[in-house]
From Swiss-Prot:
Residues 377-391 have a biased composition (Acidic residues). Probable adapter protein that bind to and organize the subcellular localization of a variety of membrane proteins containing some PDZ recognition sequence. Involved in the clustering of various receptors, possibly by acting at the receptor internalization level. Plays a role in synaptic plasticity by regulating the trafficking and internalization of AMPA receptors. May be regulated upon PRKCA activation. May regulate ASIC1/ASIC3 channel. Residues 22-105 form the PDZ domain. It comes from Homo sapiens (Human). Ubiquitous. This is PRKCA-binding protein. Residues 376-415 are annotated as: Disordered. One of its GO terms (biological process) is regulation of Arp2/3 complex-mediated actin nucleation.
Length: 415
């Protein structure tokens, strides 16, 4: 092992500069400052911060970050000590503790290697894949446990389908009401023409009144269309603007999420590599030279986690607002639809109740003369019977003699 050599191995900083400093942290009620430590004797020449936990003194102060090297505690050097010994040194101090460190001036772009990019692609593929399928394909991955946002995304998709169905149904309903209103208008026009041409005043007035009722129903239908049409606009706004905007935010969130999970997977792989070398008793070059590559990935993971947490917070807030708008909007739209249709049917009922003109008495003989002036004159049944009796009792003129003499009674004689 490198620790058994008589000379020191120079640290391989990968061109990453460090800046020394110190920070005083006030411990919490559990006598902790909120950091985890890695490295140290006997395999690594330096100790460094692996993770800064949320809502702890170190996280709230924001001075130290993952990957920073710890050089001393309260003015005491920790060179050559193990991480367990350094943790005890920090725990022994009550109240405030001063941490001396070398700040790692890392560029996150330097940690975005081809390996991280490929891991992002793999996580994107595995996202919609079951665990059994991923395990069968041998795809290692990092997942978020108890991710409640997944259920929210499923609810968003169901809400989008609901609004899509309501939009289509409302369109069909408006189209049907428009055709119905045009039918009522046609009825009104027909009965109006009949009323104008009806010679009897009572029947004419009844037909005109019935025609006006249908025209009023047509106006009620147009008013219903004008009232419900904004509902369709609001539904389309929610469906085509609000939901796509949320999906775009979710798409950005997923990109940040996959990047964070990729760094988590990379850290896990590097930890496994280090543990394997320790188990075999073989020194690992990057560990023996300061483990700067690992510390760079730790810093990138911390920054990716910060972006992920912020983006997740934004997505949850946007989805919460979207849910509130959905609950309020759907109630308002349905109330508008129900109240408008109720008013439409009540108005139609009132108009038709006042237009109860049936039965209508119509003089068909007079009406026939009025409508058929160019036709043959109408004769009733009694006149037809008299003509039939005459034809049966008296011969026709054609059957009589052309110049037959008259008998004593003045009738024609057969020739």
């Amino acid at each position: 092992m490198f620790a058994d050599l008589d000379y020191d191995i120079e640290e391989d900083k990968l061109g990453i500069p460090t800046v020394p400093g110190k920070v005083t942290l006030q411990k919490d009620a559990q006598n902790l400052i909120g950091i985890s430590i890695g490295g140290g004797a006997q395999y690594c020449p330096c100790l460094y911060i692996v993770q800064v936990f949320d809502n702890t003194p170190a996280a709230l102060d924001g001075t130290v970050a993952a990957g920073d090297e710890i050089t001393g505690v309260n003015g005491r050097s920790i060179k050559g000590k193990t991480k367990v010994e350094v943790a005890k040194m920090i725990q022994e101090v009550k109240g405030e503790v001063t941490i001396h460190y070398n700040k790692l001036q890392a560029d996150p772009k330097q940690g975005m290697s081809l390996d991280i990019v490929l891991k992002k692609v793999k996580h994107r593929l595995v996202e919609n894949m079951s665990s059994g399928t991923a395990d069968a394909l041998g795809l290692s991955r990092a997942i978020l446990c108890n991710d409640g946002l997944v259920k929210r995304l499923e609810e968003l998709e169901r809400t989008a389908e609901l609004y899509k169905g309501m939009t289509e149904h409302t369109k069909n309903l408006l189209r049907a009401f428009y055709e119905l209103s045009q039918t009522h208008r046609a009825f009104g026009d027909v009965f109006s023409v009949i009323g104008v041409r009806e010679p009897q005043p009572a029947a004419s007035e009844a037909f005109v009144k019935f025609a006006d009722a249908h025209r009023s129903i047509e106006k009620f239908g147009i008013r219903l269309l004008k009232t419900i049409k904004p509902m369709l606009t609001d539904l389309n706004t929610y469906l085509n603007k609000a939901i796509p905007d949320t999906r775009l935010t979710i798409k950005k969130y997923l990109d940040v999420k996959f990047e964070y999970l990729s760094y988590c997977l990379k850290v896990k792989e590097m930890d496994d590599e280090e543990y394997s070398c320790i188990a075999l008793g073989e020194p690992l070059y990057r560990v023996s030279t300061g483990n700067y590559e690992y510390r760079l990935i730790l810093r990138c993971r911390q920054e990716a986690r910060a972006r992920f947490s912020q983006m997740r917070k934004d997505v949850l807030e946007k989805m919460e607002l979207l849910d509130q708008k959905h609950v309020q909007d759907i109630v308002f739209q349905l109330q508008r639809l129900v109240s408008t249709m109720s008013k439409y049917y009540n108005d139609c009922y009132a108009v038709l109740r006042d237009a109860d003109v049936f039965p209508i008495e119509v003089d068909l003989a007079h009406t026939t003369l009025a409508y058929g002036l160019n036709q043959e004159e109408f004769t009733d049944g009694e006149e037809e019977e008299e003509e039939e009796d005459t034809a049966a009792g008296e011969p026709s003129r054609d059957t009589r003699g052309a110049a037959g003499p008259l008998d004593k009674g003045g009738s024609w004689c057969d020739s």
